[in-house]
Amino acid sequence: MDRKILIVVENLPVPFDTRVWQEATTLAANGYTVSVICPIGKGYDKEYEFLQGVHVYRHKLPKDGNGALGYAREYGTALWHEYRLARKCYKEVGFDCIHGCNPPDDIWMIARLFKKKGVDYIFDHHDICPELYEAKFGKTASMFYKSQLWLERQTYKHCKFAFVTNESYKKIAIERGGMKAEDVFVLRSGPKLERLKIQEPKSEIKRGKKFMVGYLGVIGQQEGIEYLLKAAKYIKELPGHNDVFWGIVGGGPDLERMKKLCHEMGLDDIVEFTGRVPDQKLLDYLNTADVCVNCDEYNAMNDKSTMNKVLEYMALGKPLVQFDLTEGRYSAQDASLYAEHNDANDMARKILELLDNPEKRKWMGEYGRNRVINELGWEHTSKALLEGYDKYFRSRGK
């Protein structure tokens, strides 16, 4: 089988980007020749390596841009390196199509440069960039917001077919991107159960507290860590409830600001920010947690997006609390309690409801894990990836 795919991801390296790496290794395991272009970072600094059957090409990037000139420099530099490495990959390995993973919505430009060679563009829609811009800056009338809509339209205009993470994104692909429904495949970012091992809790992590609330994820502007800290303060100030430890696992651009806010709120004795940690330490914390939290605030971006952490909590058999978001509710269903939109006090009350009811926690955790085992795990969701590419290559006579 001579089916060759080049995956381009601009914002994260592989294997750190779990979705992209699962896609790449699944395709390679099913007989495809797979290459990936990505940035250097997160401890992955080799410019080339052949890893688990995948050719990986990496490039350096400037620091994240701020302002129009900063973003132009960041994205322009990325596009140049992607084009340079795509040419190198085409000569050394070859590819029939470029599988572009956003954000940002600009990788179609690289694919256009290879169109005369018969290379098609396949879009992998990870984030809805117009809504992401709105969540960060709130300026839907601005030129930059409109440019995000234009880039998204161009992305769909130039792609042969698309993978999307959920039904909300599929609706956008059809209504905003003009795609035919049969050319849009829902490829959910299901976790691999062999990566997320259930193990015995480590009581020492709780710092002597009776309960632990866990969070896993990026510490960024739109992740809603402020709500989590407000919920922690609400519970701490209730009489007789200074028995909860909060473990916040993950790094990101807002980590230091959130640490400072935590200190100002007087929560240093019950909240720990671990930063980015090795996988085993991550598992230690999540397995020790009694309840896990997805504190992403309600906005147009988060309401339509599937959060990996929700599925990872479920895979580990953890009950969770989150704000009532469309795709969050679809993923978790009865494995979660749902707080009112952006109401930290209601989130705190929902957390207390679970901490006070061990039987309910156990039932919800088992429900969530079974949902991953039987429906939402990568073993099931990856079928859409293989179906989409089989259809594509058969249309090319391969």
Regions found by a protein language model. Name each.
Residues Y44, L79-E82, F95-G118, I122-E131:
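An aromatic- and histidine-rich active-site surface loop
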Residues M1-Y44, Y48-V56, S189:
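N-terminal subdomain of nucleotide-sugar transferases
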Residues S168, S189-G190:
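Carbohydrate-associated surface elements
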Residues P239, V249, E256-L283:
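Nucleotide-activated donor-binding/catalytic signature segment of Leloir-type glycosyltransferases, i.e.
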Residues S336-A344, E353-E359:
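Conserved acidic donor-binding segment of nucleotide-sugar-dependent glycosyltransferases
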Residues L6, F163, K206-A232, G247:
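Conserved donor-binding/catalytic core segment of Leloir-type glycosyltransferases
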Residues Y83-R87, D106-M109, L113-K117, C129, ...:
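Membrane-proximal helix-turn-helix segments that form the acceptor-binding/catalytic region
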Residues D17, E223, Q280-D284, N294-A315, ...:
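Nucleotide-sugar-dependent
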